[in-house]
């Protein structure tokens, strides 16, 4: 009996010591960083950090606009192979965000922000030089290129979050960060179209590499120095804090699962390795879940997740998968079906920058007067309406009818869903896991774009009669997007109703208590 008591007491002491260590680690995340002291310095500071979002979306736009120009240089016309130009990039952006955020927490956010831009610069340059190689090397460069934004986004958000206290200034800075996304996509599309059409497409990637190098150097100088988080090697192992086992199994599972979905339309699902990789990827994700449930410092703490988290992430996954389908096939529709040049198509997409900025400002106002669940419902509706408009647009219809309205509407889905989801997750998570909210949203956004393209590509390859009827394939892919965003509306409406009923119940209980 005494032996059992001593063992129990020893376990309690060990658990208490572990909790103290974890509290020490988590307290490091709450440190307030020094804000730049002058307006000029602060403007440069915010500009460099917002460039993380801008360059991330520019990386997506630079492959979509000159898609066929790049494909022709490699002798590629298959839609499934072309979709890899965008999906390989989004795959790694979504896969590595959680790991990048954890590394930033341990080794310093500024360090990994700067390294992210250097990495982005290197693989942008190599993507341009892939013109001398083949499409497979270009796809690999795009995948490695996407790891740069994966390190930029969570660390930029963490730096901003630690620098600004809650208030109007912080809301303004985060609104600017969100508004950079549509503008970044437009800039990437315009410059890559112009260079691809009038000069040589690799120049878009070489210029991107130079710009990222300049931003890396700028980030080193304009981001204030922050003290390195303390790491007591005698207290806990570094690999345990990084969650090495969870990171490896999670990355392998996500990559294999996504690769199978995007490669299936290219080689056909009857090819054995496609469904084999899908099964193996799922197996690794199951192992990842098992490891995370027992890890001391889990990359994805299941204890912090709730039914509210599932609702929010389901909405984001459905809406942004729909967005990925919309933007990829709208570009194909403009260039293939309507015979437009990449530069003209980019010009027609220019309203996304203005509409996105208006959406970001409006969302900031709505979130202070309307429940985030209602804003999320509006966002899912925007995704659905925008996709319906382009899916039913006749080929020879004027741009100013359905296409223009669709391009105006879709940024509202983008810029309303992201901040609403971040706030909703933040409200539903414990204080010590606040940094996880934005990282989770970013992960699901980018991974869903890539998966959505894989699902749509499978549908397109089944209905376009071997490429003889491309328009039929585009429309059926859009219909899939409508189904996904419609599912988002259903989930958002259910969540909004559930939130309303919970609020009503709390008010009723409070009144009953007062009486």
Curated annotation (Swiss-Prot):
Molecular function GO terms recorded: ammonium channel activity
Transmembrane segments annotated in the record for this chain: 79-99, 112-132, 141-161, 172-192, 203-223, 242-262, 271-291, 311-331, 347-367, 375-395, 404-424, 436-456, 480-500
Gene Ontology biological process terms from the UniProt entry: ammonium transmembrane transport
Family: Belongs to the major facilitator superfamily.
Effect of a null allele: Does not affect boron tolerance. Impairs methylammonium (MA) transport and toxicity.
Keyword Transmembrane helix attributed: yes
Intracellular or extracellular location(s): Cell membrane
One term under GO cellular component: cell periphery
Extracellular compartment residues: 1-78, 133-140, 193-202, 263-270, 332-346, 396-403, 457-479
Domain of life of the organism encoding this protein: Eukaryota
Coiled coil feature spans: none
Protein name per UniProt: Low affinity ammonium transporter
Ranges of the Cytoplasmic topological domain: 100-111, 162-171, 224-241, 292-310, 368-374, 425-435, 501-515
The gene coding this protein: AMF1
């Amino acid at each position: 009996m005494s032996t059992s008591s001593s063992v129990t007491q020893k376990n309690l002491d060990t658990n208490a010591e572990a909790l103290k260590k974890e509290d020490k680690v988590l307290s490091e995340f709450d440190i307030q960083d020094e804000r730049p002291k002058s307006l000029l310095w602060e403007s440069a500071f915010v500009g460099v950090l917002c460039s993380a979002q801008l360059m991330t979306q520019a990386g997506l736009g630079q492959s979509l606009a000159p898609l066929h120009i790049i494909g022709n240089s490699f002798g590629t016309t298959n839609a499934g192979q072309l979709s890899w130009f965008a999906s390989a990039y989004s795959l790694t952006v979504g896969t590595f965000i959680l790991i990048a955020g954890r590394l930033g927490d341990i080794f310093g956010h500024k360090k990994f922000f700067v390294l992210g831009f250097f990495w982005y610069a290197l693989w942008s340059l190599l993507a341009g030089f892939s013109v001398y190689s083949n499409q497979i090397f270009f796809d690999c460069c795009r995948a490695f290129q996407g790891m740069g934004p994966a390190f930029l986004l969570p660390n930029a958000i963490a730096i901003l979050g630690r620098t600004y206290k809650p208030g109007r200034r912080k809301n303004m800075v985060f609104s600017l960060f969100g508004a950079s996304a549509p503008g970044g996509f437009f800039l990437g599309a315009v410059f890559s179209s112009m260079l691809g059409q009038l000069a040589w497409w690799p120049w878009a990637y070489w210029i991107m590499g130079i710009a990222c190098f300049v931003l890396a150097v700028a980030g080193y100088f304009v981001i204030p120095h922050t003290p390195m988080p303390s790491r007591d090697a005698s207290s806990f192992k570094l690999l345990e804090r990084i969650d090495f086992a969870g990171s490896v199994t999670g990355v392998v599972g996500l990559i294999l699962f996504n690769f199978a979905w995007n490669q299936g339309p290219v080689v056909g699902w009857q090819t054995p390795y496609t469904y084999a990789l899908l099964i193996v990827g799922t197996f690794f994700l199951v192992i990842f879940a098992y490891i995370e449930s027992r890890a001391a410092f889990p990359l994805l703490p299941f204890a912090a997740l709730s039914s509210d988290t599932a609702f929010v992430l389901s909405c984001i996954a459905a809406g942004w998968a729909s967005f990925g389908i919309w933007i990829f096939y709208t570009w194909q529709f403009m260039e293939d079906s309507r015979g437009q040049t990449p530069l003209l198509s980019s010009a027609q997409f220019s309203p996304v920058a203005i509409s996105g900025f208006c959406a970001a400002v409006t969302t900031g106002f709505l979130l202070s007067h309307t429940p985030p669940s209602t804003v999320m419902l509006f966002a899912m509706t925007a995704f659905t309406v925008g996709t319906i408009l382009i899916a039913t647009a006749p080929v020879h219809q004027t741009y100013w009818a359905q296409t223009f309205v669709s391009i105006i509407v879709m940024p509202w889905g983008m810029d309303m869903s992201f901040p609403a989801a971040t706030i909703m997750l933040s409200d539903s998570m414990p204080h010590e896991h606040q940094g996880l909210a934005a990282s989770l949203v970013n992960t699901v956004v980018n991974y869903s774009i890539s998966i959505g393209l894989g699902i749509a590509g499978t549908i397109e390859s089944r209905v376009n009669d071997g490429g003889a009827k491309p328009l039929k394939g585009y429309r059926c892919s859009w219909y899939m997007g409508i189904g996904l965003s419609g599912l988002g509306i259903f989930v958002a409406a259910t969540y909004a109703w559930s939130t309303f009923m919970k609020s009503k119940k709390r008010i009723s209980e409070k009144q009953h208590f007062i009486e």
